[in-house]
Amino acid sequence: MKKSIAGFTLIELMIALALGTIVTAAALMLFISGQRDIALQQASADIQSSGNFGLGFITKDIRLANLDAANTLLKKDTIYGGVVIATSNYPQSMQQAVSGKNVFSSSIGSTSNVKDPSNTSINSAQLVIQFKAQNDGFNCEGKAYTAGNYIVERYFLREDTGAGNEPNKPLGLACEATSYVDGGNAFNDTNFGSGSGQLIIRRVDYFHVLLNVSNDNNDVFKYLDINNYASDSTNLHINAVQIGLLVRSNDGLGSNNLRADQQYQVLNQSVVVNTDSNIKTPFLRKVIQQTVALRNAGLGISDTVTAAGGQ
């Protein structure tokens, strides 16, 4: 007697194939979702490491600004003033050497990848600080300096020449540094103000700086950008520097939740990132801000000292 052989019916086979397809699709979706989560976490890590840690490196030197200045009340005419606004912040012996050079803080000092909500391009700021070195050390470019010299550091945005195919301009926050001796008439690096410096924070679309200022009675405090402070006739004194950065991830994300027209608030400035039609991959961006109190600026307490090699 022949044994009957049972097999799949056509309907059972179709159901099995359908279930297999569903399971495979679910596994594929989990894999894609996991990859996106990994990319998002990596992008966040990029911003945390380059942004927050880099900002900490910068603020360490900014806190030294105004060290051994002619007056602890930091103003735009303070000799050896920690935030360099005008030629009067340099000693008389240096003023001819710095005249006409890019060695001053400015609200429109360098390039950016942003515009305001009305579609007008906005430049990034430039911050120049100086302080007297109390000990031998290294400046923001990693170059050694000697105790007793005045150290000058310039923070600005520039393009990363080693970048690949990236959206807009691959900008980063760089620092260029030099020094001068007390009573000297030139920087140790005569090209200071035109060099490329050392990149500190990669992929910064916008750099903005505000100054916390007050009058001599310390009853009016406000924030001004550098150019408005420079043009203010009341010669307010500077108490703190507020820094704002729009930092982006190094790599793009496969996410549709990131809008190209998103507005970012960087201190008192609303900005929108310039769009690049050649790049379809979105990037994660984050605003990083920090206020640095200038410990050597006296916070409104005048304590004039004799400036060696001054006016």
Whereabouts are the PLM-identified features?
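Aliphatic-rich helix starts adjacent to a transmembrane/signal segment
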Residues: 2-67, 303
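N-terminal pilin/flagellin-like segments and related low-complexity appendage regions
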Residues: 41, 54-244, 250-284, 289, ...
